[in-house]
Amino acid sequence: MLQTKDLIWTLFFLGTAVSLQVDIVPSQGEISVGESKFFLCQVAGDAKDKDISWFSPNGEKLTPNQQRISVVWNDDSSSTLTIYNANIDDAGIYKCVVTGEDGSESEATVNVKIFQKLMFKNAPTPQEFREGEDAVIVCDVVSSLPPTIIWKHKGRDVILKKDVRFIVLSNNYLQIRGIKKTDEGTYRCEGRILARGEINFKDIQVIVNVPPTIQARQNIVNATANLGQSVTLVCDAEGFPEPTMSWTKDGEQIEQEEDDEKYIFSDDSSQLTIKKVDKNDEAEYICIAENKAGEQDATIHLKVFAKPKITYVENQTAMELEEQVTLTCEASGDPIPSITWRTSTRNISSEEKASWTRPEKQETLDGHMVVRSHARVSSLTLKSIQYTDAGEYICTASNTIGQDSQSMYLEVQYAPKLQGPVAVYTWEGNQVNITCEVFAYPSATISWFRDGQLLPSSNYSNIKIYNTPSASYLEVTPDSENDFGNYNCTAVNRIGQESLEFILVQADTPSSPSIDQVEPYSSTAQVQFDEPEATGGVPILKYKAEWRAVGEEVWHSKWYDAKEASMEGIVTIVGLKPETTYAVRLAALNGKGLGEISAASEFKTQPVQGEPSAPKLEGQMGEDGNSIKVNLIKQDDGGSPIRHYLVRYRALSSEWKPEIRLPSGSDHVMLKSLDWNAEYEVYVVAENQQGKSKAAHFVFRTSAQPTAIPANGSPTSGLSTGAIVGILIVIFVLLLVVVDITCYFLNKCGLFMCIAVNLCGKAGPGAKGKDMEEGKAAFSKDESKEPIVEVRTEEERTPNHDGGKHTEPNETTPLTEPEKGPVEAKPECQETETKPAPAEVKTVPNDATQTKENESKA
């Protein structure tokens, strides 16, 4: 019965609802957490004054104008339900109920499902880790359904890498054991929900920070103090991120301030420069590198060395024969300097020691000096003080950095000490000084006495006294025998006095030298001798050699300087004839006069040997640096006069220059315009009628070429060298033309005359009957057809030594050899050829031919 009743009511309501139809659009809805959605409830029917209401899943009626779940009545036939920022609790069936004015109701429902969308709740980027630690990459995913998490790196699943260091934890975090710098990069955390086909991912940047490593380039740095130098300490640091650098000195931070003149940092602070290093900068410096991953430091020891410096010396004063005196020297420096002692004449510290107690005491062999050293202090003790100990003492402090020296002075007071030659020689009328040297401190007063009488006096008018700080000179001019004898020099100071007797002795002439040996040659002889046994009290000034041929009455003589002759004990006499017996004797000359003459010693000169000896060569460089004067010192001529010298020279490894022929009287040859900075060799041969000597050899080097400095910097000032040379050549040619024309008209000779004779048929100068002496070069018809030349010299020729009737070389002596081939004469155009040589060469008349012929026959 009850079921029937319910069915009746249902049919009633259905019949009524036909007129009120309720629809909700959309009919169902899914909302992701946090999203918003609205639903429209629409009523269809004729009912008026309808009431539309919304009910929550828990049956509560929803009121309008709420903030999160809002109900808005649009018009009589619709109403909107809006859910803002949905959450899980908002899920359920929402009902829209429409009530008519007759109380009838119609409703519609919508099932609202709220789900959590796949989202990343905690997956920060970047995530940083320290190299070497176990890194865990965080990625928290929220979703309604449990998601599947996949980790990817460089597009590949990290699990597929088969690297045991990569592990996905139970909370879906990715763990990398012992993470490396190479593991750095982008990692993708990817979530998937199979039921919804939903996928989402998050790229996480993984940064691996590397702890800094730091190393000092030099763990120990040495510097020298007080030289104004700078020193730079350098540390090399690596790490990621790039580490910042800082420095400490003995544990205290070094800060660079503005206008800091002591410390300078590089841009990255890896270098610390310390300016004007001094001893206070010696310390332990630490460079510190720091970044996110940690910090590390390195230590540098700065060792500052100092040059030695003498810090204390003191002058001392002592009395002669005092027991001892000590000189002290103190020095600073690092390393600790060693201190040595010396004077101007001796190195005390390097002398052999009688005893040496290291390191305190060193004693000289004579026990007179003792050196004691300890650390930076050294002392020099002198025992039994002598006046010769006075003077400068130099203390030198040395270490590996350098050295320093200071002088101190020891003043020794002592009574006068006199010195000087006791015996002084002179002769009547010859002025002489008697020297009395005085050593005294304090200075002494010097007096001269003669027979107890103070000098000078009225009785001795020929005496004068001259005093200097170190000596007194008694000038005596003896008038008679009475002026010779004893003279007394007395010196007095506050310490004591001293006297010294001098004897003025009358000098005598020297005894005779003794001839040991005579070494004869064909034209010279060397006399070896011993000096006189008695000089007469005064130095020998000269030696006199006398010689003559046996049977002659007249002695030839020559004076020789005593210093030069005494060096080898030899004098050389020249101008002798070959195969002739001579007697020679010697005498010595001093200020008093010529002494006894020695006994004569006979010798016989040798026959003519033929070739002369090679000359001795000495060079003297010119001021210009590329010229030289070679002096020719004549030696033995072999018994025949030297005709000429032949000179050849060249730069080493170069060709020989043309031979130069010098007359026999020449004593030098000038070589000019030589190559700069080149080594030259010179050969000189002497030639007489018997032949040539061996070559004398001389080697020299020219100077380096000086840098030319123009007199005027203007390039256009003055004429160039080429222009000047050109002008001179033009002038010279014009002069030659003028001279030739003059010769043509006045003497009927010259170039124009030759042209006139050969081309124009004019009669030459020979047509006028002039002989050979007036216009032609002389030729020797029977021997040589070369022109005879003369050599002008300033020296006289030496006499012939062979005793024959040889004609001596004179101004007409020919220098050409008769054995050479003839030269054809060109009388039409006779010209003189001049070759560059120190001697002047010219043609001479033919009458000189006979002289050459006679000389050749000799």
Swiss-Prot record:
The modification Phosphoserine is found at S780, S784. Disulfide bonds join C41-C96, C139-C189, C235-C287, C329-C395, C436-C489. Residues 768-809, 817-834 have a biased composition (Basic and acidic residues). GO terms for biological process: cell adhesion; commissural neuron axon guidance; epithelial to mesenchymal transition; regulation of semaphorin-plexin signaling pathway. Residues 740-858 are cytoplasmic. Polysialylated at Asn-459 and Asn-488 by ST8SIA2 and ST8SIA4. Polysialylation modulates cell interactions by confering both attractive and repulsive properties that are highly regulated by ST8SIA2 and ST8SIA4. Polysialylation is formed on a-2,3-linked sialic acid of core glycans. Residues 1-19 form the signal peptide. The chain crosses the membrane at residues 719-739. Residues 20-718 are extracellular. Glycans are attached at N222, N315, N347, N433, N459, N488. PROSITE patterns: FN3 (PS50853), IG_LIKE (PS50835). Residues 509-608, 611-706 form the Fibronectin type-III domain. The keyword Repressor does not apply. Residues 20-111, 116-205, 212-301, 308-413, 416-501 form the Ig-like C2-type domain. Changing N459Q: Loss of polysialic acid addition by ST8SIA4. Loss of polysialic acid addition by ST8SIA2. Loss of polysialic acid addition by ST8SIA4. Loss of polysialic acid addition by ST8SIA2. Decreases polysialic acid addition by ST8SIA2. CDD domains: FN3, Ig, IgI_1_NCAM-1, IgI_NCAM-1. One of its GO terms (cellular component) is cytosol. Keywords: Cell adhesion, Cell membrane, Disulfide bond, Glycoprotein, GPI-anchor, Host cell receptor for virus entry, Host-virus interaction, Immunoglobulin domain, Lipoprotein, Membrane, Phosphoprotein, Receptor, Repeat, Secreted, Signal, Transmembrane, Transmembrane helix. Residues 766-858 are annotated as: Disordered. (Microbial infection) Interacts with rabies virus glycoprotein. This protein is a cell adhesion molecule involved in neuron-neuron adhesion, neurite fasciculation, outgrowth of neurites, etc. (Microbial infection) Acts as a receptor for rabies virus. This is Neural cell adhesion molecule 1.
